[in-house]
UniProtKB/Swiss-Prot annotation:
Family matches, as SUPFAM superfamilies: Nucleic acid-binding proteins
GO CC annotation: cytosolic small ribosomal subunit; ribosome
Annotated region (Disordered), positions in chain: 1-44
Gene: rps12
InterPro entries: NA-bd_OB-fold (IPR012340), Ribosomal_uS12 (IPR006032), Ribosomal_uS12_arc (IPR022863), Ribosomal_uS12_euk/arc (IPR005680)
Biased amino acid composition, Basic residues: 7-16
Protein name: Small ribosomal subunit protein uS12
Entry-linked Pfam families: Ribosom_S12_S23 (PF00164)
Keyword Cytoplasm: no
GO biological process: translation
């Protein structure tokens, strides 16, 4: 490192070069998060339900979390989405159109005891899943 009255340019250049050693900085600058994200940086996405799946919770919990496999409309990628709410899975059928969003885990990843599930179902055929579970709305017949 250089010291001195006129060393600012060298210090700045060295700092800019060293930043690339930080993996988070490098990923952010190269846009790798958006590249690997099935939603391509969007907050929500629409998809078609392929199948219902039950995913076992990680230790020490013991449960089968109800999820669905969804094929996104925008790019054809398949993701697993969690169905929040008591009995929510009963309102979702195969070939329904669902809106999914991030599940809200740390650093945009999985949440709690659900490994590999980064998304949750928000709407089914344009109607909020929470409204369906509460009984405030009815699922439209397509």
């Amino acid at each position: 490192m250089t010291n001195g009255k006129y060393a600012a340019r060298k210090l700045k250049k060295d700092r800019q070069q060293r930043r690339w050693s930080d993996s988070e900085y490098a990923r952010r600058e190269r846009g790798l998060g958006k590249k690997s994200d099935p939603l391509e940086g969007a907050p929500q996405g629409r998809g078609i339900v392929l199948e219902k799946v039950g995913i076992e919770a990680k230790q020490p919990n013991s449960a089968i979390r109800k999820c669905v496999r969804v094929q996104l409309i925008k790019n054809g990628k398949q993701v697993t989405a969690f169905c929040p709410g008591d009995g929510a899975i009963s309102f979702i059928d195969e070939h329904d159109e669902v809106t999914i969003a991030g599940i809200g885990g740390a650093k945009g990843r999985a949440m709690g005891d659900l490994s590999g599930v980064n998304y949750k179902v928000e709407k089914v055929n344009g109607v909020s899943l929470i409204e369906l579970v509460r009984g405030n709305a009815e699922k439209p017949v397509r």
